[in-house]
Amino acid sequence: MQKLIILLLVAAVLMSTQALFQEKRPMKKINFLSKGKTDAEKQRKRSCSDDWQYCEYPHDCCSWSCDVVCS
């Protein structure tokens, strides 16, 4: 009976330390249920309004400064 109690206490300590370490680990963003961008969202990103517009890919660039950032 005493061995069982000691075993349960050791298991509880190990589980609590594991939970503490997992809590400190940075959480990754999970987007497997999110949908992709719509055509309107893609088009909005491509239509640059100024020289410093953000672009993701080289074919999204609308100006020379944006092209330099993408390259």
Swiss-Prot record:
One of its GO terms (cellular component) is extracellular region. Pfam families: Conotoxin. One of its GO terms (molecular function) is ion channel inhibitor activity. InterPro entries: Conotoxin (IPR004214). Residues 20-43 form a propeptide. Expressed by the venom duct. Keywords: Cleavage on pair of basic residues, Disulfide bond, Ion channel impairing toxin, Knottin, Secreted, Signal, Toxin. It is found in: Secreted. The keyword Disulfide bond applies. Disulfide bonds join C48-C62, C55-C66, C61-C70. Residues 1-19 form the signal peptide. Belongs to the conotoxin O2 superfamily. The presence of a 'disulfide through disulfide knot' structurally defines this protein as a knottin. Inhibits voltage-gated ion channels. This is Conotoxin Vc6.12. It comes from Conus victoriae.
